Amino acid sequence: MFNAASREREPDTYTPYICHASPSGLLLDDGSLLAMLRLDGAAFETADPIVVNSMHAQRNILLRNIASDRVVLQTHVVRTLADASVYPPEQCSSAFARALDDGYRARIMSNRLFRNDLFLSVLLRATSRAGLSEGNIASLFARRKRGDRARTASPANLEQLAGIVSTLLYELHAYGVRQLELREENGLMFSERAEALRLVLTGEHMSVPLVNGHLGGAIYTDRVIVGREAIEIRGAGGSSYAVGFGLREYPAVTWPGMFDTLLGAPYRCVLTQSFGFLGKQAAQGIMTRKQNQMVTAQDKAASQTEALTEAADMLASNAFVMGDHHLSLMTFADSLDKLRAVAASARRDLAESGAVIVREDLALEAAYWARLPGNMRLRSRPGAISSRNFAAMASLHNYPLGAARGYRQRVRGRPRRLRQNDAHVVPAGDGRAAESHDSPIRQG
């Protein structure tokens, strides 16, 4: 028993979040800072392709403006079950209206209702050791315990993170963006960022209080048991099961909305993408090395060699920036039997993007925890792509949203009815009507 206890990992092993360092940032164990934004998303079903392409170009420009080798962006699309108790208790003035409302309510509530939550995380990595001042050299040899509360955030780093967040809030206003902060409820303080991180982990909504100790211990409260092909998330009310997918090879082209099928999926899932900016010199080196490898191997893909040359020229002309990209899809179900059907459907939906999909097995545990900001070391099969590719893959699309309570109700007023969006499968030809871009580097 004691040997098993010694092998048990601490809750903060993979949740490296110490505390709230400021209204805009969480402090991580390694000194990095994390800010999180929540987005309503942009409506896409009836949007004109010109508008879709314009918004894609604007996202690419935004990425170029905030590019820094210390910045990592991470997007989460969380599809989970909606609360069926949020149907507005509206009073009807006639018997016919009451009968119509009762019938409509019964029909809506007989279905499984889903909702999509979109999050954008901004991670400002700690200053490299080469950039430490002489007075801080001694800190390299000081042994720190994980989650040392004595660690403080640099005012300069906090200011830099706040500047990036301000830029994102301004440029993404069309997506209904707001910053996650602390909220007060019944005299208690809760962390919206910790709640979002827990939602990414488990696919379930739950309040996370502000604690005096390590914040990671408040986020990781369900027991995660990793098997050979699936993960069991054992909570107080029962267990749920998860399986993960990743990209083995990137698609030849990317276009805005290439993963929109998942927004209407009949299962719970979390789509995670991370993009760590690369310096121009490092990006040019990756392209040159890839091109030299193809020439040395006498690769017959002449079009790809030409595309690399063109991409290197566009990179030098500041048409885009490059970054280290990773994508994973984690699906959830209430039982292993249901998980098999969900996994088959999820793999098919993800493959509609044109990528080669692989189910995680040996790297399943790493794939599960790599979805959290700050765990980039756990990513498997990352690939270098351009900001234009990432702006297309992370399109920030969503169905129109309302709210029975909270921030959106305060802005838009009291809701009248609950409406359900039906998911429609868009033909491949229609889905690619928007502008597409070749991937300058394809994962092999």
Set out the residue ranges of the language-model regions.
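Glycine-rich phosphate-binding loop of nucleotide-binding enzymes
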Residues: 42, 49-52, 57-64, 396-444
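Extended, folded cores of ATP/NTP-driven motor/assembly subunits in large transport
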Residues: 1-395
